[in-house]
C-alpha cells in the first residue's frame, strides 16, 4: 500500500492541506479528517478488533471494527471500503452514516494525540475475514448489547473514540437498529 496522508482541517472543518499519516500523529496532532466504522455480520453481531501492538497510537487496545483516513479526492464511504479490504480482507455493504458529526481529541498513554473530525459509519460484511496482522492482533464477533454494556462498565478497556461514539444516544440507537436488521 502506498504512503497514506491525512487531510488537515481548520477549526471549521475546511481542508487546508495534507500531511503524511505517520508524521501527523504526535503529541501535537493537528486537526484532520478520519472515519470510524462498526461492521456487523449477517447474524447482527458486531466485529470488535484489537489494534496490533505495532500501531503508533493505542497499540493492543480493543476498538470498533475499522478506522482510517480518507485520502485526497476519496469519499469517506470509499475510504471505509478501502480500509476494510486492507485491514480485514473483507467486502462490505455500502457504509451508512450513524454519527456524521463526531469529532474528538484524545491522548494515549504514550502521549500520542488523536485530533479528528471522524464521521462514524455502519456496514455489513459480505465475505469472510482475512485479517492483516500488521493492523489487527485479535478480533471477536459480539452481540452489540454486550459490547455496549462492556463499554459502560469498563470504558478503560476500549479505545476512547469507541467509548465516545457509544456514549452518543442517537448513534447508539442507529447502531442497535442496524444490528437488528438482518
Curated annotation (Swiss-Prot):
Residues annotated as binding Mn(2+): 25, 32, 69, 114, 116
Gene Ontology terms for molecular function: isopentenyl-diphosphate delta-isomerase activity; metal ion binding
Catalysed reactions listed for this entry: isopentenyl diphosphate = dimethylallyl diphosphate
Start and end residues of each Nudix hydrolase domain: 30-164
Gene Ontology CC terms, in alphabetical order: cytoplasm
Cofactor: how and how many bound: Binds 1 Mg(2+) ion per subunit. The magnesium ion binds only when substrate is bound.
Enzyme class: isomerase
Enzyme Commission designation: 5.3.3.2
Homology family: Belongs to the IPP isomerase type 1 family.
Name of the protein this chain belongs to: Isopentenyl-diphosphate Delta-isomerase
Originating organism: Escherichia coli O17:K52:H18 (strain UMN026 / ExPEC)
